[in-house]
Curated annotation (Swiss-Prot):
Protein name: Non-specific lipid transfer protein GPI-anchored 16
Disulfide bonds listed in the record: C27-C72, C38-C56, C57-C98, C70-C107
Signal peptide: 1-20
Record carries keyword Nucleotidyltransferase: no
Main localization category: membrane
Membrane topology per record: Lipid-anchor; GPI-anchor
Gene name of this polypeptide: LTPG16
Organism: Arabidopsis thaliana (Mouse-ear cress)
GO biological process: megagametogenesis
Family: Belongs to the plant LTP family.
Glycosylated residues (UniProt): N87
Tissue spec. comment: Expressed in seedlings, preferentially in hypocotyls and roots. Also observed in siliques.
Propeptide positions: 178-200
Compartment list: Cell membrane
InterPro entries: Bifun_inhib/LTP/seed_sf, Bifunc_inhib/LTP/seed_store, LTSS
Length: 200
């Protein structure tokens, strides 16, 4: 019975370890924790202060010296933080506010955002182009365009939700639970086979 318990514990540790799909970034948790003095400034929650604290500038200098890749991701607002959204304008202004010059040259190419963790969605193919030799093109060429009726919009302007400029929402997909991870684990059939063999 003790051998069975040991096997179950070992198999469950294999199943639960390392199954989450995570994107590898140059930012470690210790790098982000040393950058915490700047989080209020780059998220816009510093109470309207336009200058970062001395501790923030010191941590930015340390981060650019030890982890330029992580600093670039933070300064270009391309790393999601658990504390809130990064205001890209404030993040790009941080090096100048700390009297370090502009955004480092190494960060200029870091303007592309990271993909969200999880599966890649299927893309819808664009509609086919109408060529001059297709039947649809000859019918379209023979008709004259008509004026479309004006849409019913109020004279005040468009109605609908307004967005705040400078704040970019980040969609964070839910992480799979332990049950979902273990059901897709390749070690699950091995666990069942070992349990059957131990019962024989």
């Amino acid at each position: 019975m003790e051998g069975l318990t040991l096997i179950v514990v070992m198999m469950s540790s294999f199943m639960l370890g390392g199954q989450g799909q995570q994107i590898s970034t140059p930012c470690t948790s210790s790098m982000i924790s040393t950058f915490t003095p700047c989080l209020n400034f780059i998220t816009g929650s510093s109470g309207g202060s336009v200058t970062p604290t001395a501790g923030c500038c010191d941590s930015l200098k340390t981060l650019t010296n030890t982890g330029m890749g992580c600093a670039c991701l933070i300064l270009t607002a391309n790393v999601p933080l658990p504390t809130g959204f990064i205001n890209r304008t404030l993040a790009l202004a941080l090096p100048r506010a700390c009297k370090m010059g502009g955004v480092p040259i190494q960060c200029q190419a870091a303007g592309t955002p990271l993909p969200a963790p999880g599966q890649v969605p299927f893309l819808i193919a664009p509609p086919p182009q109408v060529s001059a030799f297709s039947p649809g093109a000859s019918k379209a060429a023979g008709t004259t365009p008509t004026q479309a009726p004006a849409p019913d919009t109020p004279a005040d302007g468009p109605t609908g939700p307004t967005t705040k400029s400078g704040i970019r929402p980040v969609d964070q997909p839910m992480q799979p639970t332990g049950l979902a991870q273990s059901s897709t684990s390749p070690f699950l059939p091995l666990l069942f086979i070992s349990l059957i063999l131990l019962n024989l």
